[in-house]
Protein backbone atom coordinates (compact mmCIF):
# COMPACT_ATOMS: atom_id res chain seq x y z
CA UNK A 1 0.00 0.00 0.00
CA UNK A 2 2.97 2.34 0.57
CA UNK A 3 4.12 1.88 -3.03
CA UNK A 4 0.57 2.42 -4.26
CA UNK A 5 0.33 5.63 -2.22
CA UNK A 6 3.45 7.05 -3.87
CA UNK A 7 2.23 6.05 -7.34
CA UNK A 8 -1.08 7.84 -6.74
CA UNK A 9 0.57 10.99 -5.37
CA UNK A 10 3.02 11.03 -8.30
CA UNK A 11 0.09 10.93 -10.73
CA UNK A 12 -1.61 13.79 -8.90
CA UNK A 13 1.66 15.74 -8.98
CA UNK A 14 1.91 15.17 -12.73
CA UNK A 15 -1.58 16.64 -13.21
CA UNK A 16 -0.54 19.68 -11.17
CA UNK A 17 2.65 20.06 -13.23
CA UNK A 18 0.42 20.27 -16.29
CA UNK A 19 -1.71 22.90 -14.55
CA UNK A 20 1.36 24.92 -13.54
CA UNK A 21 2.71 24.86 -17.10
CA UNK A 22 -0.64 25.86 -18.60
CA UNK A 23 -1.03 28.74 -16.16
CA UNK A 24 2.55 29.85 -16.86
CA UNK A 25 1.65 29.88 -20.57
CA UNK A 26 -1.55 31.87 -20.01
CA UNK A 27 0.47 34.43 -18.05
CA UNK A 28 3.04 34.57 -20.87
CA UNK A 29 0.40 35.37 -23.51
CA UNK A 30 -1.32 37.90 -21.26
CA UNK A 31 -4.53 36.04 -20.38
CA UNK A 32 -3.63 36.36 -16.69
CA UNK A 33 -1.81 39.11 -14.85
CA UNK A 34 -0.12 38.76 -11.47
CA UNK A 35 -0.46 41.05 -8.50
CA UNK A 36 2.87 42.67 -7.74
CA UNK A 37 4.44 41.83 -4.40
CA UNK A 38 6.48 44.58 -2.78
CA UNK A 39 10.17 43.70 -2.66
CA UNK A 40 9.87 40.71 -5.00
CA UNK A 41 12.46 40.55 -7.79
CA UNK A 42 11.12 39.21 -11.07
CA UNK A 43 14.40 39.23 -12.99
CA UNK A 44 18.03 39.90 -12.14
CA UNK A 45 18.47 41.98 -15.32
CA UNK A 46 14.97 43.26 -16.18
CA UNK A 47 13.51 45.25 -13.26
CA UNK A 48 10.08 45.62 -14.92
CA UNK A 49 9.35 41.89 -15.12
CA UNK A 50 6.79 40.13 -12.95
CA UNK A 51 7.78 36.52 -13.51
CA UNK A 52 5.45 33.57 -12.82
CA UNK A 53 8.03 32.41 -10.28
CA UNK A 54 5.57 30.53 -8.07
CA UNK A 55 4.41 28.34 -10.93
CA UNK A 56 8.01 27.70 -11.98
CA UNK A 57 8.92 26.74 -8.40
CA UNK A 58 5.88 24.48 -8.19
CA UNK A 59 6.79 22.70 -11.42
CA UNK A 60 10.38 22.18 -10.30
CA UNK A 61 9.49 20.86 -6.86
CA UNK A 62 6.77 18.56 -8.22
CA UNK A 63 9.43 17.17 -10.56
CA UNK A 64 11.87 16.45 -7.73
CA UNK A 65 9.08 14.93 -5.64
CA UNK A 66 8.04 12.66 -8.49
CA UNK A 67 11.59 11.49 -9.13
CA UNK A 68 11.68 10.25 -5.54
CA UNK A 69 8.11 8.95 -5.47
CA UNK A 70 8.41 7.04 -8.71
CA UNK A 71 11.52 5.35 -7.38
CA UNK A 72 9.77 4.55 -4.11
CA UNK A 73 6.76 3.15 -5.98
CA UNK A 74 8.97 0.97 -8.17
CA UNK A 75 11.44 -0.13 -5.49
CA UNK A 76 9.33 -0.95 -2.45
CA UNK A 77 7.47 -3.95 -3.95
CA UNK A 78 10.84 -5.58 -4.70
CA UNK A 79 12.91 -7.40 -2.09
CA UNK A 80 15.81 -9.63 -3.05
CA UNK A 81 14.92 -13.06 -1.65
CA UNK A 82 12.50 -11.23 0.63
CA UNK A 83 15.31 -10.24 2.97
CA UNK A 84 17.50 -7.43 1.59
CA UNK A 85 17.70 -4.10 3.41
CA UNK A 86 17.54 -1.69 0.50
CA UNK A 87 14.02 -0.72 1.58
CA UNK A 88 15.34 0.90 4.73
CA UNK A 89 17.72 3.07 2.69
CA UNK A 90 15.00 4.12 0.27
CA UNK A 91 12.42 4.79 3.00
CA UNK A 92 14.69 7.45 4.48
CA UNK A 93 13.60 9.61 1.52
CA UNK A 94 9.87 9.42 2.24
CA UNK A 95 9.98 12.71 4.12
CA UNK A 96 11.83 14.41 1.29
CA UNK A 97 9.34 13.18 -1.32
CA UNK A 98 6.36 14.42 0.68
CA UNK A 99 8.21 17.59 1.65
CA UNK A 100 8.92 18.56 -1.96
CA UNK A 101 5.26 17.92 -2.77
CA UNK A 102 4.14 20.22 0.04
CA UNK A 103 6.58 22.94 -1.04
CA UNK A 104 5.22 22.66 -4.58
CA UNK A 105 1.60 22.84 -3.36
CA UNK A 106 2.40 25.93 -1.30
CA UNK A 107 4.04 27.58 -4.32
CA UNK A 108 1.04 26.74 -6.48
CA UNK A 109 -1.39 28.16 -3.93
CA UNK A 110 0.68 31.33 -3.60
CA UNK A 111 0.78 31.74 -7.38
CA UNK A 112 -2.96 31.22 -7.77
CA UNK A 113 -3.53 33.88 -5.12
CA UNK A 114 -1.69 36.42 -7.30
CA UNK A 115 -3.65 35.73 -10.48
CA UNK A 116 -5.99 38.21 -12.05
CA UNK A 117 -7.66 37.52 -15.42
CA UNK A 118 -7.03 40.07 -18.14
CA UNK A 119 -10.49 40.10 -19.69
CA UNK A 120 -9.50 42.64 -22.34
CA UNK A 121 -6.68 40.43 -23.65
CA UNK A 122 -8.87 37.33 -23.66
CA UNK A 123 -11.73 39.11 -25.43
CA UNK A 124 -9.38 40.63 -28.00
CA UNK A 125 -8.18 37.16 -29.02
CA UNK A 126 -11.69 35.73 -28.99
CA UNK A 127 -13.16 38.53 -31.08
CA UNK A 128 -10.58 37.88 -33.78
CA UNK A 129 -11.18 34.11 -33.86
CA UNK A 130 -14.03 33.93 -36.36
CA UNK A 131 -12.96 30.43 -37.34
CA UNK A 132 -14.59 29.09 -34.15
CA UNK A 133 -17.95 29.68 -35.86
CA UNK A 134 -17.17 26.84 -38.26
CA UNK A 135 -18.76 24.51 -35.70
CA UNK A 136 -22.30 25.95 -35.69
CA UNK A 137 -22.21 26.65 -39.43
CA UNK A 138 -21.35 23.10 -40.42
CA UNK A 139 -23.89 21.75 -37.91
CA UNK A 140 -26.66 23.80 -39.57
CA UNK A 141 -25.44 22.77 -43.02
CA UNK A 142 -25.75 19.12 -42.04
CA UNK A 143 -29.24 19.69 -40.67
CA UNK A 144 -30.33 20.95 -44.08
CA UNK A 145 -28.68 18.08 -45.92
CA UNK A 146 -25.82 20.00 -47.49
CA UNK A 147 -23.22 17.43 -48.52
CA UNK A 148 -19.60 17.52 -47.35
CA UNK A 149 -20.44 20.19 -44.78
CA UNK A 150 -17.55 19.35 -42.48
CA UNK A 151 -15.06 19.16 -45.33
CA UNK A 152 -16.19 22.50 -46.76
CA UNK A 153 -15.64 24.28 -43.44
CA UNK A 154 -12.37 22.45 -42.90
CA UNK A 155 -11.06 23.64 -46.27
CA UNK A 156 -12.22 27.18 -45.53
CA UNK A 157 -10.94 27.59 -41.98
CA UNK A 158 -8.23 25.08 -41.11
CA UNK A 159 -5.01 26.95 -40.44
CA UNK A 160 -6.59 30.18 -41.66
CA UNK A 161 -7.39 33.43 -39.89
CA UNK A 162 -10.96 34.33 -40.70
CA UNK A 163 -12.90 37.56 -40.32
CA UNK A 164 -16.58 38.50 -40.45
CA UNK A 165 -16.49 39.37 -44.14
CA UNK A 166 -14.86 36.13 -45.34
CA UNK A 167 -17.22 34.02 -43.24
CA UNK A 168 -20.28 35.91 -44.47
CA UNK A 169 -19.13 35.52 -48.08
CA UNK A 170 -19.09 31.77 -47.51
CA UNK A 171 -22.54 31.85 -45.91
CA UNK A 172 -23.91 33.66 -48.95
CA UNK A 173 -22.96 30.68 -51.14
CA UNK A 174 -25.15 28.30 -49.12
CA UNK A 175 -28.70 27.26 -49.90
CA UNK A 176 -30.28 27.87 -46.51
CA UNK A 177 -33.59 29.35 -45.37
CA UNK A 178 -33.34 33.12 -44.98
CA UNK A 179 -34.08 33.08 -41.25
CA UNK A 180 -31.40 30.44 -40.65
CA UNK A 181 -28.89 32.39 -42.70
CA UNK A 182 -29.57 35.57 -40.73
CA UNK A 183 -29.24 33.68 -37.45
CA UNK A 184 -25.81 32.40 -38.48
CA UNK A 185 -24.75 35.86 -39.64
CA UNK A 186 -25.75 37.29 -36.27
CA UNK A 187 -23.32 34.98 -34.47
CA UNK A 188 -19.98 36.33 -33.27
CA UNK A 189 -17.06 34.50 -31.65
CA UNK A 190 -17.97 36.25 -28.41
CA UNK A 191 -21.65 35.29 -28.44
CA UNK A 192 -21.34 31.65 -29.56
CA UNK A 193 -20.99 29.24 -26.65
CA UNK A 194 -22.16 25.95 -28.14
CA UNK A 195 -22.41 23.38 -25.35
CA UNK A 196 -19.65 25.00 -23.29
CA UNK A 197 -21.96 26.22 -20.53
CA UNK A 198 -23.68 22.83 -20.20
CA UNK A 199 -20.41 20.89 -20.21
CA UNK A 200 -18.83 23.23 -17.65
CA UNK A 201 -21.79 22.81 -15.29
CA UNK A 202 -21.40 19.02 -15.46
CA UNK A 203 -17.79 19.00 -14.24
Language-model segment annotations:
Residues 1-66:
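Acidic, glycine-rich loop-and-beta core segments that form the ion-binding/anion-interacting portion
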Residues 30-31, 43-203:
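Glycine-rich cofactor/substrate-binding loops
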Amino acid sequence: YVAEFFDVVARLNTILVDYARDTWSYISIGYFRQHQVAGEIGSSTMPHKVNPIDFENAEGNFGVANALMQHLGAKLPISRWQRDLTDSTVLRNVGSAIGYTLIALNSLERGIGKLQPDNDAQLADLRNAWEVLAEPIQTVMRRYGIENSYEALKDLTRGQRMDRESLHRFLDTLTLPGAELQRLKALTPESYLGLAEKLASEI
